[in-house]
């Protein structure tokens, strides 16, 4: 099941995490958050605070007995709805924080960024995005394959 809501930030996700995710008693919980924070959908928030929100959700899931997959933020070099933001370096920094947290807190890190990045632009390749942030069906297919190969061993 998916509990994602378009436009929500990590703070929004954290607020509804117990009712929307923990209450479902999933064996595995996947968390993908950060781009709407970087886009300042709710105003400025530091990468440290974004990570704190992600960590809070991961800890709630683990306390509930779920295994946790922490997904990287996808590559982005533009935010169409907030063009003043230059997200590429912020995404790279947040992903390094998420990865370090995952490695030190018994979570699995799913690195979409490395597989999907256009090294020249530090964003998504044009063929995989509709606007620099949101992905095409082709990109979803790549992500689905990566997600399922990460998920399957955790279900054993």
Task: Enumerate the predicted regions with their spans.
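Alpha-helical cap/lid subdomain in secreted, periplasmic
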Residues: 12-156
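A short beta-strand-loop structural module common to alpha/beta enzyme folds
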Residues: 1-9
């Amino acid at each position: 099941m998916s509990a994602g809501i378009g436009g929500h930030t990590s703070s929004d996700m954290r607020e509804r995490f117990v009712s929307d995710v923990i209450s479902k008693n999933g064996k595995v919980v996947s968390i993908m958050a950060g781009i709407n924070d970087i886009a300042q959908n709710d105003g400025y928030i530091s990468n440290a605070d974004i990570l704190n929100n992600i960590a809070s959700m991961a800890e709630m899931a683990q306390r509930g007995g779920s295994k946790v997959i922490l997904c990287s933020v996808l590559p982005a070099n533009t935010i169409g709805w907030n063009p003043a933001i230059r997200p590429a370096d912020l995404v790279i920094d947040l992903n390094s924080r998420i990865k370090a947290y995952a490695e030190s807190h018994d979570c699995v890190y799913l690195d979409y960024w490395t597989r999907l990045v256009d090294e020249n632009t530090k964003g998504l390749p044009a063929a995989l995005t509709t606007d620099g942030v949101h992905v095409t069906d082709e990109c979803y297919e790549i992500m689905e394959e990566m997600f399922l190969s990460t998920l399957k061993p955790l279900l054993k």
